[in-house]
């Protein structure tokens, strides 16, 4: 990240596993032994230390444990991405570990719309069933770092932290109670915290939150094919440059209809989320209003994605096969333009609406 320091060059001094051992042992001696301070060494990087169990053990087994030495590890075997597998370095080795969790993912709206991921990080996603909760209950990790905000470089910029707070509250309370308080109990505590008025509101807020997790899987990622996870990030909706390899795979495996159906399923889910949001009342009118506005925001975002994705995929399919589905493409273009107009009106008419996405990448 040296883009603002044009005359500087960033480079790591760590090139081998043994380099890690030398560095960590120096830090351990200077910080833990000589000064009796806490040392938290973050494993995040692209060389394997963060995601390879053999790499991790090869380094850490050569370092003597210390009560004030911790290793910090993301819960994903990659960046904080929905389709990333559970990190295999968690719960292994001799050293105490801190697990990192992100409440505001830059690839998934940054809190601009519902995105409840804490439950599935704890109990397992449909496509990635490993469960962090079991490690917490067995006290195999020493604690958690929660990125309550942050992630990414730009927008959307939010006017209310509700959805970031939900993920942060559930995860922090679960680790604080060492798993002896269930996710469901903690979720109900959050409903009380935001002043939901009645059982119907609590029930609808629960359904809405759980549905958001599935909706983002189908709207942004896929359960059927590999996709460039970074085709959207921050407030940018990427295009054919980011999705060409994905489209090649979809076409080669005859999954065009499946791919479009996933996006349609996501939009139907968001329609249900909007319906549920209109039947949720909080004693705090700002909260009630934001639930409605942010749910509409999510609907427009993923409806736009569905149409844009369809236009690009069907257009690319036409280039490959020389057989264009012209009427479907025209219909999606008309819907795409209309949805963008309505999305902009949502922002113009609501002061608490997050800043909008842009129809292009960085």
Where are these regions (language model features)?
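Substrate-binding groove of N-acetylhexosamine-processing glycoside hydrolases
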Residues: 14-362
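Active-site groove signature of glycoside hydrolases
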Residues: 1-14
């Amino acid at each position: 990240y040296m883009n603002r320091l044009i005359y500087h060059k960033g480079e790591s001094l760590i090139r081998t596993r043994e380099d890690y051992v030398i560095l960590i042992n120096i830090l351990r001696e200077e910080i833990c032994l000589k000064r009796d301070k806490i040392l938290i060494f973050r494993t995040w990087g692209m060389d394997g230390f963060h995601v390879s169990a053999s790499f991790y053990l090869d380094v850490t087994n050569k370092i003597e444990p210390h009560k004030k030495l911790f290793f910090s590890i993301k819960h994903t075997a990659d960046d904080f991405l929905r389709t990333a597998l559970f990190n295999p370095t968690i719960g292994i080795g001799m050293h105490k570990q801190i697990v990192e969790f992100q409440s505001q993912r830059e690839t998934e709206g940054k809190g601009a719309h519902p995105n409840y991921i804490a439950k599935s990080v704890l109990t397992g996603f449909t496509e990635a069933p490993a469960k962090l909760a079991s490690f917490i209950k067995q006290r195999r990790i020493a604690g958690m770092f929660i990125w309550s905000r942050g992630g990414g470089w730009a927008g959307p910029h939010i006017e209310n932290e509700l959805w970031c707070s939900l993920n942060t509250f559930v995860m922090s309370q679960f680790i604080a109670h060492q798993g002896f308080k269930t996710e469901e109990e903690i979720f109900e505590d959050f409903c009380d915290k935001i002043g939901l008025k009645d059982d119907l509101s609590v029930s609808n807020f629960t359904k809405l939150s759980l549905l958001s997790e599935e909706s983002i899987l189908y709207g942004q990622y896929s359960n059927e094919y590999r996709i460039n996870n970074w085709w959207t990030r921050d407030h940018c909706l990427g295009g054919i440059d980011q999705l060409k390899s994905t489209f090649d795979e979809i076409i080669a495996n005859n999954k065009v209809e499946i791919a479009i159906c996933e996006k349609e399923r996501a939009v139907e889910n968001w329609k249900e989320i909007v319906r549920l949001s209109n039947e949720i009342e909080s004693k705090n009118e700002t909260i009630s209003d934001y639930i409605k506005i942010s749910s509409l925001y999510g609907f427009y975002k993923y409806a736009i994605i569905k149409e844009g994705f369809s236009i690009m995929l069907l257009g690319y399919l036409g280039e490959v096969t020389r057989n264009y589905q012209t009427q479907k493409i025209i219909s999606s273009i008309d819907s795409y333009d209309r949805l963008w107009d309505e999305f902009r009106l949502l922002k113009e008419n609501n002061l608490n609406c997050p800043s909008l996405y842009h129809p292009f990448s960085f």
